[in-house]
């Protein structure tokens, strides 16, 4: 392909993402677009075709961004190359959305006609505006009886500031109106403008590990071209490789002769060292490198930390290898080794939220055949010590002795809760109960309010989202961002089983709620931990002060069953022998703690009962 042909091809490229609040129909719209561009045969077509992880299909959510190249024959008679990137909708995966948008010129914003504009809809609009993208509003599910397309258009105008007349009414399920969306993409999304003759400059927006090909880089080529046999350089580490293959996903990988400025595709170069590749890095030519790298991505800060431990300590190295491979595919995951007296060796992992943590644990167990125990999640605390130094504490077990602590600061979030007027009362009540500070209330329309509170992150990760949904019958939507650290009256609560501290069950709580939480946790653990042949006391303590206690009763074997009822001496002797045996067993007996016990520190009673 000569330069003129490349320039002509570039004019026909359209790079766009589909973004929306969770459950508004992104993946269904992606399915229809694939169908209408004949990218996939009727035989291969299935729902959520781009959600290729079994976990995504089971949960019905998108977890990973997914890029696919399509050819669309437009009404003007020309063929256009669409690079479509499907993105997640859950707040935990907003990092995936921001990476997708950096590889695009346009964003199709899907809004559910039955739900209207929700918190994550707004968050995605701001991400798209940050990346200077053309936003195409689409109103989905207009075929449902409860759909209100006119009301939704008004929200799009009032709350987002987009022209409601530009919004396209569609039903992604039936395909109605989708052809109009495709035509708008051709007309309104600008073609990429990268210089084809400049040195290669490509942004790595995702990557994964393949056992046969090594690391597969997903790239958006910004300038120049790359083909098989070229020498490339990863600018972050300076490592050089020879390109083994370039291609596009359509949706299966298809090798191509060349990737040029504007293309979204993949590069393989027999990269075996996972540490060499980083999402956000710039790929350039080793022989003719570019002067300065692309801006890349801001480093994500984990919001939630938890310990991951293999049930078999011999699998520690397998867990490390698995985490390294997952980190390649999920740049927001962080981990470092740690050890626990109760659980042995494992890793302290950082996640963006509880769903992110759940998904990582499930992927590790499924994809890498590991059996894991996860400790209760916690946040990062800033501890000011009496000697003037500050320590960051991610693990409650590492909290310094209370006598050496001057102050403890905890992270707060600015929570934006969109809710119908009728439910403002229950929402404010919930926020107050969760130690929230009221900020402001914005009336978005006659029927909807945006309530803004500053709430400790530790309260958000506990059970806030479930309580919010139940107190508003599912109508509220939540978006939040970190809002700095504030001093709080916090204490570390230790859990003792049979008199021994279990470091992995320690947690941090506000002093005002410490006794209540201690009683809750000990009661939950009593339900979960199996009975033994000896009585097990469960205690919650702040330092040396016990604030709550309960006992798990011992199994009682009837040792007197075989003796004659009229022999009281023999009976007393056997009972005394049993008592002495249990006392000895209690002194040396180790209590087996099931996985559910570690999550009991987090879950509410209702959630435990459901299990």
Swiss-Prot record:
Ranges where the tr-type G domain occurs: 11-193
Enzyme Commission number, as recorded: 3.6.5.n1
This protein's record includes keyword Methyltransferase: no
Annotated keywords: Cell membrane, GTP-binding, Hydrolase, Membrane, Nucleotide-binding, Protein biosynthesis
Reaction catalysed by this enzyme: GTP + H2O = GDP + phosphate + H(+)
Top EC class, one word: hydrolase
Family to which the UniProt record says this protein belongs: Belongs to the TRAFAC class translation factor GTPase superfamily. Classic translation factor GTPase family. LepA subfamily.
Job of this protein: Required for accurate and efficient protein synthesis under certain stress conditions. May act as a fidelity factor of the translation reaction, by catalyzing a one-codon backward translocation of tRNAs on improperly translocated ribosomes. Back-translocation proceeds from a post-translocation (POST) complex to a pre-translocation (PRE) complex, thus giving elongation factor G a second chance to translocate the tRNAs correctly. Binds to ribosomes in a GTP-dependent manner.
Name used for this protein in its record: Elongation factor 4
Source species: Limosilactobacillus reuteri (strain DSM 20016)
Gene: lepA
């Amino acid at each position: 392909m000569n330069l003129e042909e490349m320039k002509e091809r570039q004019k026909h490229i359209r790079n766009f993402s589909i973004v929306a609040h969770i459950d508004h129909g992104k993946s269904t719209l992606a399915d229809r677009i694939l169908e209408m561009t004949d990218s996939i045969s009727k035989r291969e077509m299935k729902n959520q075709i781009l959600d290729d992880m079994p976990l995504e299909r089971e949960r019905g959510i998108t977890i990973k961004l997914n890029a696919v190249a399509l050819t669309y024959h437009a009404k003007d008679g020309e063929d256009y190359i669409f690079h479509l990137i499907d993105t997640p909708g859950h707040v935990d995966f907003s990092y995936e959305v921001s990476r997708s948008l950096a590889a695009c010129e346009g964003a199709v914003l899907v809004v559910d006609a039955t739900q209207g504009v929700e918190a994550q809809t707004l968050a995605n609009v701001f991400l798209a505006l940050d990346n200077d993208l053309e936003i195409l509003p689409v109103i989905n599910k207009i075929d449902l009886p409860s759909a209100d397309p006119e009301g939704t258009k008004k929200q799009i105008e009032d709350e987002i500031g987009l022209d409601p007349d530009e919004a396209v009414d569609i039903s992604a399920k039936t395909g109605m109106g989708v052809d109009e969306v495709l035509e708008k993409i051709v007309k309104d999304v600008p073609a990429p403008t990268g210089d084809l003759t400049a040195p290669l400059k490509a942004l790595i927006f995702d990557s994964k590990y393949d056992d046969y090909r090594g690391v597969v880089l997903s790239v958006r080529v910004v300038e120049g071209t790359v083909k098989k046999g070229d020498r490339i350089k990863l600018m972050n580490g300076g490592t050089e490789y020879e390109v083994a293959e370039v291609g596009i996903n359509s949706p299966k990988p298809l090798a191509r002769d060349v990737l040029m400025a504007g293309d979204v595709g993949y590069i393989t170069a027999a990269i075996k060292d996972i540490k060499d590749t980083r999402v956000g890095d710039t790929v350039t030519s080793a022989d003719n490198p570019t002067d300065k790298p692309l801006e890349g991505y801001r480093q994500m800060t984990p919001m939630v930390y938890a310990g991951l431990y293999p049930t078999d300590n011999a699998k520690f190295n397998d867990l490390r290898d698995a985490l390294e491979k997952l980190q390649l595919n999920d740049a927001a995951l962080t981990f470092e080794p740690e050890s626990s007296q109760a659980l042995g060796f494992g890793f302290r992992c950082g996640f963006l939220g509880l769903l992110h943590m759940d998904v990582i644990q499930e992927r590790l167990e499924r994809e890498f055949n590991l059996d894991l125990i996860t400790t209760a999640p916690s946040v990062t605390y800033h501890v000011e010590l009496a000697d003037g130094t500050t320590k960051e504490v991610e693990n409650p077990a590492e909290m310094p002795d209370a006598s050496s602590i001057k102050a403890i600061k905890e992270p707060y979030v600015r929570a934006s809760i969109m809710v119908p007027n009728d439910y403002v009362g229950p929402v404010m009540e919930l926020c107050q109960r969760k130690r929230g500070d009221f900020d402001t209330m914005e009336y978005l329309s006659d029927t909807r309010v945006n309530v803004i509170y500053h709430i400790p992150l530790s309260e958000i990760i506990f059970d806030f989202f479930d309580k919010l949904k139940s107190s508003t019958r599912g109508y509220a939507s939540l978006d939040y961002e970190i809002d700095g650290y504030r001093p709080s009256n916090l204490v570390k609560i230790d859990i003792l089983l049979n008199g021994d501290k279990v470091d992995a069950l320690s947690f941090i709580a506000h002093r005002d709620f410490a006794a209540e939480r201690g009683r809750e946790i000990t009661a939950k653990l009593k339900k979960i931990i199996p009975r033994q042949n000896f009585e097990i006391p469960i205690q919650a303590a702040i330092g040396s002060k016990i604030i709550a206690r309960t006992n798990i009763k011992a199994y009682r074997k009837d040792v007197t069953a075989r003796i004659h009822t009229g022999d009281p001496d023999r009976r007393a002797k056997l009972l005394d022998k049993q008592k002495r045996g249990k006392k000895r067993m209690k002194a040396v007996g180790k209590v087996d703690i099931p996985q559910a016990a570690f999550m009991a520190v987090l879950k509410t009673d209702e959630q435990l009962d459901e299990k």
